[in-house]
C-alpha cells in the first residue's frame, strides 16, 4: 500500500489560502506562477500545482531574469527545470534590463518585472499571475508606506486580488526597448486594447472609474475619462494568496516537499529600504513590542483597504456628479461644491480628477496647492502640475487643462 506523508499545518494553511483566493471554477484557464527560485515562489508553485487542477485550471510559470547577478541565467534555467518537475506548462523565461529604467534600483527592477508580466499575459492569454507575497512582505510594505508619509493609502498595503500592480502602471515601449512607469492607482487598459482576458474573480464595482493604459495613443494628452463602459471587461489579474501565510511557513512548505530554494543576495543588501526594515527594524519591533507586530500590521492593512476603498468610492461618485469636460484638453470643477465637501473627500476628488482625466498622480503638495485655489482671498490663482498640466481658478470654477488646451 502506497504511504502518503501527512501534510503539515503550513501546507494545509497555504492550500486553504489559495483555494479561498481563486475562483471555484477556472474553466480550464491558465494561471501563471511568478517564479524567482526563492522559498516563497517555490512554495506558491507546489501549492498551485495541487490546488489549481482541482479548480479546473492549468498551471504555468513565468521566470523573470533581471540580469543583476552573474549567474542569473543559470538560476533561471534551474528554476525552469524545477517547474517542469511539477508539470507546469508553459514555463516562460523573460529577461529584462532594469538599468534601462530611470528609477532607483528597487523601483527599476519592479518596473521591468511587471512589464515582463504584462508581456507574458498578452503572449499566453493567461487568466492571472500569482505573486507569492507573504504576511511578512505585507508588514514590510505597510512600514515602507509609513516612511513615505503617504497617508491612509500607505496603510492598505497589497491587495489579495488586484488588476494592476499596486501604485504603478507599466508600459513596455518595444520600439526603443525601454520601460517607463506612470504612477497611478487601480488603472486599467482602455477599450482599444482588446487583449482577450477572462473576467476577474470578484464582481466589478460598476461605480468605479478606470483609466487609459499608457500605450493608448488614441487619447494621448487629452482630457478623456474612462469608465467601465469604455473598458474591455477582460483583463489580467494579479493574485496574492499568501498574504496571511508567513515566510516561516513558506520555508516549512519547501522543507515538506524537499525543495532547495535560492537566496537572492539582494535580500541581504542593506542599501535597500525593504532589506533594512526586514533585518534591522522588524526584529527590534518584535523584541521590544512583541512577536505579534507583523500580524498587527497585516491586520491594519486589511482594515485600511476597507476604509480607503469606501472613501474612494464616495469620491468617484462626487467626481461623476460635478466634473464637466470643457474640451478635449480641459475640465472644470465647481468651487462651491468643493468648498462644502469634507476635506478627505475633497482632496481625493482633486487627485482623482488629475488621475482619471490626465493620468497624472498628484503629490500631497500639488493637491494642497490646488485646494488653495478654492480660497478667493488667497494670492494663488494657478498651479503648475506635472506633464504640462495646469490648474487655474476662473470665476466659480477650477479648470484643469493641458498646455494644448490653455484657456
Curated annotation (Swiss-Prot):
Residues reported in the UniProt entry to bind ATP: 36-41
Keyword ATP-binding part of the UniProt annotation: yes
GO MF annotation list: ATP binding; tRNA(Ile)-lysidine synthase activity
One GO CC term, this protein: cytoplasm
Entry annotated with the keyword Coiled coil: no
InterPro entries associated with the record: Rossmann-like_a/b/a_fold, TilS/TtcA_N, tRNA_Ile_lys_synt, tRNA_Ile_lys_synt_N
Signal peptide: none
EC primary class: ligase
Keywords recorded for this protein, A-Z: ATP-binding, Cytoplasm, Ligase, Nucleotide-binding, tRNA processing
Pfam families to which the protein is assigned, alphabetical: ATP_bind_3 (PF01171)
Protein name, UniProt field: tRNA(Ile)-lysidine synthase
Organism: Tropheryma whipplei (strain TW08/27)
Amino acid at each position: 500500500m502506497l504511504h502518503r506523508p501527512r501534510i503539515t499545518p503550513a501546507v494545509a494553511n497555504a492550500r486553504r489560502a489559495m483555494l479561498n483566493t481563486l475562483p471555484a471554477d477556472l474553466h480550464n484557464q491558465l494561471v501563471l506562477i511568478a517564479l524567482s527560485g526563492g522559498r516563497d515562489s517555490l512554495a506558491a508553485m507546489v501549492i498551485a500545482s495541487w490546488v489549481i487542477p482541482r479548480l479546473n485550471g492549468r498551471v504555468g510559470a513565468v521566470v523573470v531574469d533581471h540580469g543583476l547577478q552573474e549567474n542569473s541565467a543559470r538560476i533561471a534555467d534551474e528554476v525552469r527545470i524545477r517547474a517542469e518537475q511539477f508539470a507546469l506548462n508553459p514555463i516562460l523565461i523573460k529577461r529584462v534590463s532594469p538599468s534601462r529604467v530611470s528609477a532607483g534600483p528597487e523601483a527599476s527592477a519592479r518596473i521591468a518585472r511587471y512589464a515582463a508580466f504584462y508581456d507574458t499575459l498578452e503572449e499566453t492569454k493567461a487568466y492571472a499571475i500569482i505573486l507569492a507575497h507573504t504576511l511578512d512582505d505585507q508588514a514590510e510594505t505597510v512600514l515602507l508606506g509609513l516612511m513615505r508619509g503617504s497617508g491612509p493609502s500607505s496603510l492598505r498595503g497589497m491587495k489579495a486580488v488586484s488588476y494592476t500592480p499596486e501604485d504603478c502602471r507599466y508600459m513596455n515601449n518595444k520600439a526603443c526597448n525601454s520601460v517607463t512607469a506612470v504612477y497611478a492607482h487601480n488603472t486599467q487598459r482602455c477599450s482599444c486594447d482588446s487583449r482577450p482576458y477572462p473576467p476577474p474573480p470578484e464582481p466589478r464595482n460598476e461605480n468605479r472609474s478606470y483609466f487609459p493604459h499608457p500605450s493608448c495613443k488614441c487619447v494621448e494628452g487629452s482630457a478623456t475619462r474612462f469608465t467601465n463602459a469604455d473598458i474591455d471587461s477582460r483583463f489580467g489579474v494579479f493574485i496574492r494568496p499568501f498574504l496571511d501565510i508567513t515566510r516561516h511557513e513558506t520555508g516549512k512548505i519547501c522543507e515538506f516537499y524537499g525543495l532547495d530554494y535560492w537566496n537572492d543576495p539582494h535580500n541581504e543588501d542593506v542599501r535597500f529600504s525593504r532589506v533594512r526594515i526586514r533585518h534591522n527594524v522588524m526584529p527590534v519591533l518584535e523584541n521590544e513590542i512583541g512577536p505579534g507586530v507583523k500580524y498587527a500590521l497585516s491586520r491594519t492593512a486589511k482594515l485600511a483597504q476597507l476604509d480607503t476603498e469606501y472613501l474612494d468610492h464616495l469620491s468617484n461618485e462626487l467626481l461623476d456628479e460635478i466634473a464637466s469636460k470643457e474640451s478635449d484638453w480641459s475640465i472644470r470643477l465647481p468651487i462651491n461644491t468643493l468648498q462644502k465637501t469634507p476635506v478627505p473627500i475633497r482632496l481625493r476628488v482633486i487627485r482623482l480628477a488629475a488621475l482619471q482625466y490626465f493620468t497624472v498622480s498628484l503629490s500631497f503638495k500639488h493637491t494642497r496647492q490646488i485646494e488653495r485655489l478654492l480660497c478667493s482671498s488667497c494670492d494663488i490663482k494657478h498651479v503648475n502640475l506635472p506633464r504640462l498640466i495646469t490648474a487655474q481658478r476662473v470665476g466659480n470654477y477650477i479648470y484643469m487643462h493641458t498646455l494644448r488646451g490653455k484657456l
